[in-house]
C-alpha cells in the first residue's frame, strides 16, 4: 500500500483534489476528512430515511383504504334506480347507480353504463368513491351504509397525509 503524499487534499499530480468519498476505508484518513464525509453523509441518510417513510406510509394508506368497509351498492342502486342495473330513464344518467356518461368514461367505464354488468358498474363506482366520496351520490349515498363524514373526499385526505409526511422528511433532511 502506498502512503498518501504530505498534501492529503491533492492527488499525486497536484491538479485534482481528492474527494472525501474516495477516502472511505482509508486507514490514513484524518479526522478532518471524516468530518467532511459526515457532513456529506448525514443529509443523504436523512433523505433516504424520509423516502423510506414516504414509501411505507403510501403502502400503509393503500392497505387501510382497502381494509375499510365496503358500501352496499345494491342499496344505493335500489335508491337510485329501483334496483334496475339496466336503468335508462331518460334523465341523462344510466345503470343501477345512475352514472352520467362523462363520469362513467372518466373512471374507466366502457360503452353505456346501462349495458354494463352489475359487477362492472360496481368496479367503476368504487373508483368514483375513492376520488369523490359519497358526494357523487348526494341523494342515495347514505343508503350505502357508510358514514358520510368518513367517505366525503377520501382521496383528498390521503393526499394531504402523504404531503405532510413528505414535507416532514424534507425538513428532517435539511442540515442544521
Swiss-Prot record:
Induction annotation: Expressed in actively growing cells, positively regulated by alternative sigma factor SigD, probably directly.
Keyword Hydrolase: yes
Residues annotated as signal peptide: 1-29
Inactivation phenotype: Not essential, disruption of rpfC alone has no effect on growth or survival in liquid culture, nor in mouse infection models, although colony size is reduced. Alterations in gene expression are seen. All 5 genes in this family can be deleted without affecting growth in culture, however triple deletion mutants (rpfA-rpfC-rpfB or rpfA-rpfC-rpfD) are not able to resuscitate spontaneously in the presence or absence of O(2), and are attenuated in a mouse infection model.
SUPFAM superfamilies, A to Z: Lysozyme-like (SSF53955)
GO biological process: negative regulation of gene expression; positive regulation of gene expression; quorum sensing; regulation of cell population proliferation
GO molecular function: hydrolase activity
Record bears the keyword Transmembrane helix: no
A family per Pfam: Transglycosylas
Enzyme Commission number: 3.-.-.-
Annotated effect of mutating residue 80 to A: Loss of resuscitating activity on M.luteus
GO CC terms: extracellular region
Keywords: Hydrolase, Signal, Virulence
NCBIfam families: ResusProRpfC
Family per similarity comment: Belongs to the transglycosylase family. Rpf subfamily.
Function: Factor that stimulates resuscitation of dormant cells. Has peptidoglycan (PG) hydrolytic activity. Active in the pM concentration range. Has little to no effect on actively-growing cells. PG fragments could either directly activate the resuscitation pathway of dormant bacteria or serve as a substrate for endogenous Rpf, resulting in low molecular weight products with resuscitation activity.
Protein name: Resuscitation-promoting factor RpfC
Source organism (scientific name): Mycobacterium tuberculosis (strain ATCC 25618 / H37Rv)
Gene name of the encoded protein: rpfC
